[in-house]
């Protein structure tokens, strides 16, 4: 009877066996999935997370590539724009020269203007290089020098000489140097100016000696034309004789 009473009890729940193959009771509250279903869902969620991570990585890579491409395009556009402006400016100058409307400049001013335009072009190229490769562009030549010692100024002078003597064949070169030397020597003391003047005077004497030697060498190369001197002397003698004969004739006429 006791067993029957336990079966008839309202709150009776069958015992759940922990052994394999035993029938288990109803799933606990909140669990509506079969055994192993949660694991499959977790694996699926992991796959989705990996795909999303890969997609995000690709997007970031594209974002890093796109700015580089756009910067390169911008740089090319700037280069083309500067080339167009330079070409347009050159065409305007040529047109003004043809029409005669270009401003009249002295030879020194014309050479200075050419140097100024060349310097602007070099500065423009340097700025483009900085934009292309960053501020870590290595500057060489005169622009990179900041002389402070005697050796530095010697090297600086060599580079400056190479830069200026590129235009020594120009007709405006001597006048340009005259103005340049005067301008750069304005702030010097009198003693320093005397030293520079003496150096230029010595250079002038040396050039004069060279010119004299060259002129003598040219005369020696010409030589004497065969018979030329003899013919000249005979001509002079005949002229003298003719002059005497002409005087004798006049005296005879006067006597008659």
Swiss-Prot record:
Compositional bias (Acidic residues): 1-14, 35-54
Coiled-coil spans in chain: 70-99
GO cellular component: eukaryotic 43S preinitiation complex; eukaryotic 48S preinitiation complex; eukaryotic translation initiation factor 3 complex
Presence of keyword Metal-binding: no
Subcellular location: Cytoplasm
GO molecular function: translation initiation factor activity
Keywords: Coiled coil, Cytoplasm, Initiation factor, Protein biosynthesis
Biological process (GO), any one: formation of cytoplasmic translation initiation complex
Region described as Disordered: 1-109, 214-237
DNA-binding recorded as keyword: no
A Pfam family assignment: eIF3_subunit
Biased composition (Basic and acidic residues): 55-101
Chief place where the protein resides: cytoplasm
PANTHER family: EUKARYOTIC TRANSLATION INITIATION FACTOR 3 SUBUNIT J
Record text on subunit structure and interactions: Component of the eukaryotic translation initiation factor 3 (eIF-3) complex, which is composed of 13 subunits: eif3a, eif3b, eif3c, eif3d, eif3e, eif3f, eif3g, eif3h, eif3i, eif3j, eif3k, eif3l and eif3m.
Entry function: Component of the eukaryotic translation initiation factor 3 (eIF-3) complex, which is involved in protein synthesis of a specialized repertoire of mRNAs and, together with other initiation factors, stimulates binding of mRNA and methionyl-tRNAi to the 40S ribosome. The eIF-3 complex specifically targets and initiates translation of a subset of mRNAs involved in cell proliferation.
Similarity field: Belongs to the eIF-3 subunit J family.
Protein name from the UniProt record: Eukaryotic translation initiation factor 3 subunit J
Organism of provenance: Xenopus tropicalis (Western clawed frog)
């Amino acid at each position: 009877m006791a067993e029957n009473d336990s079966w008839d009890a309202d709150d009776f729940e069958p015992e759940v066996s922990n052994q394999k193959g035993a029938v288990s009771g109803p799933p606990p509250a909140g669990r509506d999935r079969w055994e192993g279903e949660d694991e499959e869902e977790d694996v699926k969620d992991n796959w989705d997370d990996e795909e999303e991570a890969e997609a995000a990585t690709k997007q970031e890579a594209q974002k890093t590539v796109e700015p580089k491409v756009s910067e390169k395009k911008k740089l090319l556009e700037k280069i083309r724009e500067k080339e167009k402006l330079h070409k347009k400016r050159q065409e305007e100058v040529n047109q003004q020269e043809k029409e005669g409307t270009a401003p009249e400049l002295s030879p020194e001013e014309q050479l200075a203007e050419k140097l100024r335009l060349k310097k602007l072009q070099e500065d423009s190229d340097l700025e483009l290089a900085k934009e292309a490769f960053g501020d870590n562009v290595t500057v060489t030549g005169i622009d990179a020098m900041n002389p402070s010692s005697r050796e530095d100024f010697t090297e600086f002078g060599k580079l400056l000489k190479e830069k200026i003597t590129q235009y020594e064949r120009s007709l405006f070169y001597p006048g340009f140097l005259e103005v340049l030397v005067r301008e750069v020597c304005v702030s010097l003391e009198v003693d320093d100016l005397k030293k520079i003047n003496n150096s230029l005077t010595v250079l002038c004497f040396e050039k004069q000696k060279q010119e004299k030697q060259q002129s003598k060498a040219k005369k020696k190369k010409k030589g004497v034309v065969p018979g030329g001197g003899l013919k000249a002397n005979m001509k002079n003698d005949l002229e003298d004789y003719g002059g005497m004969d002409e005087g004798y004739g006049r005296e005879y006429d006067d006597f008659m």
